[in-house]
């Protein structure tokens, strides 16, 4: 989802 994309970029 959205968090998956953000987390993927931030490395979280």
UniProtKB/Swiss-Prot annotation:
Localization in the cell: Secreted
GO biological process: defense response to bacterium; innate immune response
Tissue specificity remark: Expressed by the skin glands.
Keywords: Amidation, Amphibian defense peptide, Antibiotic, Antimicrobial, Immunity, Innate immunity, Secreted
Signal peptide positions on this chain: none
Leucine amide: residues bearing it: 12
Main location (coarse class): secreted
GO cellular component, one term: extracellular region
Protein function: Antimicrobial peptide with selective activity. Is only active against Micrococcus luteus (MIC=25 ug/ml) and not against Bacillus cereus, Escherichia coli, Leuconostoc mesenteroides, Micrococcus luteus, Pastewella haemolytica, Staphylococcus aureus, Streptococcus faecalis and Streptococcus uberis.
Family: Belongs to the frog skin active peptide (FSAP) family. Frenatin subfamily.
Protein name: Frenatin-1
UniProt organism field: Nyctimystes infrafrenatus (White-lipped tree frog)
